[in-house]
Structure formats: structure tokens, C-alpha cells
Amino acid sequence: MAEITIRGAGIFGLSVAWACVQRGAVVQVIDPNGPAAGSSGGIVGALAPHVPENWNAKKAFQRDSLLMAEGFWQAVEQAGGGNAGYARKGRLQPVADDAALALAQQRAETAKALWQGQATWSVIRASDTPWQPDSPTGWLIHDT
């Protein structure tokens, strides 16, 4: 008999189930649509640190959680004998106008101090990337 029942076999539900099993729990996962059916409606499948201004404990917790992801997914791969598909590539966001560019540059400086090289927020030229979203200014934010 399961000690814990998790509803949802998407990335979050399966990750919670894995963490519970690692701690010795007996777990069952229930999802009427099957594993990874995409019913959560998420379109990105990615997480990134919060913007650096107004830094608080919640934002620090999310950043710290994201930093633990590499070790988590390595353990999943080792247990499963396959590639979990984890990659820390970052995301690209177009910069809309001069005001957004100034804000992005300010955030890059704040991120350096707060994230201490563990994650990055960079302002880069769109032309410097092999693929880029349309950017009215020709600039992108790349955060990891």
C-alpha cells in the first residue's frame, strides 16, 4: 500500500515521486493522461532565477533549487540508465526598447552581485547567437 499518492505524472509530479522514493517512501503516481501528457499547459518546460531586483528569500530559494537540479538529474540518469534530457542552456528574451535595455543592463549588474557566478543574466547582441527571437532593439537577455 502506498504511503504517498501523487496526482500528475508530469515533470513536477514525477520529480516529487522520485524525491519521496529517495527518502524511503512507498509512492504511487496517478495520472489519467499518462506520463508527460502535457496537461499542465506549460509551454516552456524551463525554470530560471527570478529577476534580481527586490531580492528576497523566495527568490533565493528558487535560485538555490535550480542550482541543485544538475545533481538531481544526474542521480535520475544513474538510476534509470538513460539520458534525462537535462540541460542548463538558459533562455533568450528579446529587449523591446531603450528603457527595457537600460533595465536589462541594470539587472545584469545586480545579478552578478546576487548570483555570484552561479547563474547569469547577460545582455547580448542578437546577431551573436546562432538562433534568436525577433528583437526590435537587436539586443537579447540571456539568463541561465
Protein language model regions, located:
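N-terminal Rossmann-like FAD-binding beta1-loop-alpha1 element of flavoenzymes
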Residues: 2-28
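Short amphipathic alpha-helical surface micro-motifs
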Residues: 27-31, 73-77, 120-128
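Flavin (FAD/FMN) cofactor-binding and adjacent substrate-gating region
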Residues: 83-144
